[in-house]
């Protein structure tokens, strides 16, 4: 009872995450509220150390930044895998080494971290794709048999590549390499790919990877969102038109909050009204939404046909989450960021986990009963 009252109080005194809730279509999730007393929930930690097998030295692996989290519910707790950066490299976004840390929470708000990363560049067959930039920006889903499937970006400071890893316990991971390595004779290995949001169905507190028309589906990439299919969740093939050009299922719109770019967010979710895709959006200073800063990152929602995942039905006209708090505009990315990557149903509510200014992790909560 105390936990319930505490959460209710946090939501009551939290900050609204978006705008125009009265005009929110029925298919959209929200409104999400940012609990002010706990945010940011994960921040940089200069005391944590880790022996890097690649540099053969001890590094303070989460000293600079902790951000862009994936989330999953396991054994009655919320687990967050977050991107952590050390201070090596240039003082510039994308030029530090990233590793993935793991934290757990019994209430979805207060987290305890493991002292060392669970996924990192190692002296393995993926080293050529992951060193020296590291492993970035995870999203996670579960299979029917309890296997966890992680999409993440391999960054060797040359080409970012969307990759797959699997685990049974969230701690020990098997890397499977670039998601598109076997597609079209390997041509996608030379192209920038990232931000994979696999289609799921809700089963209790679990988001289970689900098939449509006999295939698994994944929305991915930036500045347009593309789509790929798979038979096994490991090897993926982007869909293309008759001319061999990849299909763009969601693109930027002049005059809107997503005028600069759109990028995959948390796992896509099958709902009664269709496939819900929460996505990240960037605003253009020249032809974007008036009143939003140039290059600010916000969040949007799109609805796709349940039987035809490439068919867009509707999309939001305004962001449902955007930088409003100091911690969302203070850090590596000062234009402001609410970069959504983790979404889980937990104890009757939806918890949305996001990166703030490429520096910290925030949470926003939606109670469907309050709609």
Where would I find each of the regions flagged by the language model?
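Active-site glycine/GP-rich loop and adjacent strand/helix microenvironment
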Residues: 18
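Bacterial N-terminal signal peptides that target proteins for export
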Residues: 1-6
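Bacterial N-terminal signal peptides
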Residues: 8-15
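Beta-rich carbohydrate-recognition and catalytic domains
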Residues: 22-133, 141-260, 269-333, 347-371
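Low-complexity, glycine/alanine/valine/leucine- and proline-rich hydrophobic stretches
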Residues: 335-338
